[in-house]
Amino acid sequence: PFIPIGRKSIVRAKMAEMVLSEIHNHELDAVICRAPEFYGPDKTQSITNTMFLDKIKEDKTASIPINSSCQRSLIWTPDASRAMVLIANTPSAYNQTWHLPCDKPYSYNELKQIAEKVLNKKVKVRVIREWQFNLIKPFNKSIQELSELLPRYRQDNLFVSDKFKKQFPDFKITTIGEGLSTIL
């Protein structure tokens, strides 16, 4: 069952339920690809990219939402694209839900350490607590949009893609270290 939190999550859950119902009724051949939070090159619009990685790249203080020690699964955007193409071109993959492959989870503290190793220098970070987001929320449209995602940052947010890894064992997953080396 889907347990959506927020306006956008409710819409996504309804869409997924509609697709799954049509698949179940043999009215539609489709796949659903699910992914954890994206990170990647260029203009990837994710919390981790915009608040954390982009700031590090700009040599500014990076922001960590809510909690720096919770583990998070992240997927490299080029990996997500390659995985979806692979699934789409595999007839036996249809009429299923797939969790796209990602590296092991890391905390923001660990991401900071990896970034420091890649850059060979110290990185400045600060944690923005939930009450701080709530304080700014009435005055900032971006924070209003972001607020429905904040519960995901209170605790570990782990993504399991074992089914994909078993079905496609030769798929090369970009490690967080490789990804950060490319971005930074």
Where are these regions (language model features)?
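Residue-level signal for the nucleotide or nucleotide-sugar donor/cofactor binding architecture
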Residues: 10, 75, 106, 159, ...
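A conserved structural motif in NAD(P)-dependent oxidoreductases
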Residues: 73-80
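Alpha-helical membrane-targeting segments
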Residues: 51-73, 124-157
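Mid/C-terminal beta-alpha module of Rossmann-like enzyme folds, strongest
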Residues: 83-146, 172-176, 180-184
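Active-site Tyr-X1-5-Lys
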Residues: 3-32
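NAD(P)-dependent short-chain dehydrogenase/reductase
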Residues: 25-32, 36-71
